[in-house]
């Protein structure tokens, strides 16, 4: 059988990691079912192993890194790529694995695609201040200028790369698992479980409690909304000092549990103003609930009238008004429209089909063709 072999390589893969792992897992499953396609995934691990096309490459664990590992040696990653001899490599982070892929390209003579999942200059600026921004921007320009094609999950991310001088940038949205996140997972007993009134208006936020999520805005918003509304915060590093109408599940929850909680809520709220895509927004809409998010980052692209409302960033009063307006317009009906919207545009099968078009373009073929093995 004629086979095209695609290899993904990234350090952004850990037990509790977010959008990148979700994307890679969904992609690996679907490419595995495609006739004529082989997919390999290279990720960090405690020791070398291989199972079902997923290769773990030894890398030290990051202290306090919540399962993340940081590769320090380029050689093992490059050597595995040499042994696999893929026809195309996709890079999922801007660190050592990216340079390993580019190094392997020199011997294999295959195209390498870079997927710009994380806004590195903004990330460094948030953590270390603006002094390093010019150097980080120069690094991003140099690294992503080496790829045969660059993918970005949203137009705002693509525009940032283009603004840095990176060429051949294409927007490639991510997707959502329409079976895992489904309205049928709604649990009528959740309000009783949480100890809130049956007629309460239940909001939810799911994700990491990092600075960029602007959780103080949500907490202030809940104080303004009052006891008729209740917010459930789900995820690691959540605040402990919260208003009475807020419940916290301060731990990483598997997708199945998050899906039950989402489908059982009335709406999702999100105050993060630096999102590169916003996968949790799609998960909420797939669960049949609308969203209230801030008009910033990629949310302006994925939150449409079908799925919810946008409000001014960093403004608890504006968010409270948007939540009230959402309920006044009817949450249930808008949640149904949100579900139909993601079914149409964000199913993983649709996303993978779009990815394959990018792969065909850089391989220079209309159909997958054998180049290595």
Label each region the model flagged.
Residues 111, 122-142:
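Nucleotide-sugar donor phosphate/pyrophosphate-binding loop at the beta->alpha transition
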Residues 137-186:
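Donor nucleotide-sugar binding/catalytic pocket of nucleotide-sugar-dependent glycosyltransferases
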Residues 144, 260-265:
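Short alpha-helical donor nucleotide-sugar binding micro-motif in glycosyltransferases
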Residues 196-213, 219-223:
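Conserved donor-binding/catalytic core segment of Leloir-type glycosyltransferases
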Residues 235-259, 267:
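Nucleotide-activated donor-binding/catalytic signature segment of Leloir-type glycosyltransferases, i.e.
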Residues 251, 305, 309-316, 325-330:
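Conserved acidic donor-binding segment of nucleotide-sugar-dependent glycosyltransferases
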Residues 273:
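Aromatic "clamp/platform" in nucleotide-sugar-dependent glycosyltransferases that forms part
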Residues 281, 290-293:
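Short hydrophobic beta-strand element within catalytic cores of glycosyltransferases
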């Amino acid at each position: 059988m004629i086979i095209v072999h695609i290899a993904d390589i990234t350090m952004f893969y850990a037990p509790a990691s977010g959008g990148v792992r979700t994307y890679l897992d969904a992609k690996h499953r679907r490419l595995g079912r495609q006739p004529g396609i082989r997919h390999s995934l290279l990720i960090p691990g405690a020791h070398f192993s291989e199972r079902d096309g997923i290769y773990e490459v030894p890398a030290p664990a990051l202290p306090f890194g919540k399962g993340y590992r940081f590769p320090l040696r380029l050689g093992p990653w490059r050597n595995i790529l040499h042994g696999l001899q893929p026809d195309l490599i996709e890079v999922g982070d801007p660190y050592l694995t990216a340079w390993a892929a580019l190094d392997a390209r020199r011997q294999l003579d295959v195209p390498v695609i870079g997927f710009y999942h994380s806004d590195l200059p903004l990330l460094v600026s948030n953590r270390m201040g603006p002094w390093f921004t010019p150097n980080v921007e120069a690094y991003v320009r140099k690294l992503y200028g080496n790829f045969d094609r660059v993918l970005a999950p949203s137009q705002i991310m693509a525009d940032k790369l283009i603004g840095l001088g990176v060429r051949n940038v294409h927007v490639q949205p991510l997707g959502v698992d329409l079976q895992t996140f489904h309205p049928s997972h709604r649990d009528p007993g959740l309000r009783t479980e949480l100890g809130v009134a049956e007629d309460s208006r239940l909001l939810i936020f799911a994700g990491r409690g990092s600075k960029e999520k602007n959780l103080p805005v949500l907490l202030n918003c809940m104080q303004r909304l009052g006891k008729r509304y209740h917010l459930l915060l789900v995820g690691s590093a959540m605040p402990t000092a919260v208003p009475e109408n807020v419940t916290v599940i301060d731990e990483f929850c598997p997708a199945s549990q998050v899906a039950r909680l989402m489908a059982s809520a009335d709406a999702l709220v999100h105050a993060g103003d630096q999102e590169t895509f916003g996968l949790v927004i799609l998960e909420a809409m797939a669960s049949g609930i609308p969203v209230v998010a801030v008009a910033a980052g990629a949310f302006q692209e994925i939150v449409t009238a079908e799925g919810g409302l946008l409000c001014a960033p960093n403004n608890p009063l504006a968010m409270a008004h948007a939540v009230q307006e959402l309920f006044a317009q009817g949450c249930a009906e808008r949640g149904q429209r949100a579900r139909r919207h993601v079914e149409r545009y964000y199913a993983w099968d649709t996303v993978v089909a779009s990815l394959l078009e990018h792969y065909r373009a850089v391989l220079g073929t209309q159909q997958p063709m054998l180049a290595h093995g």
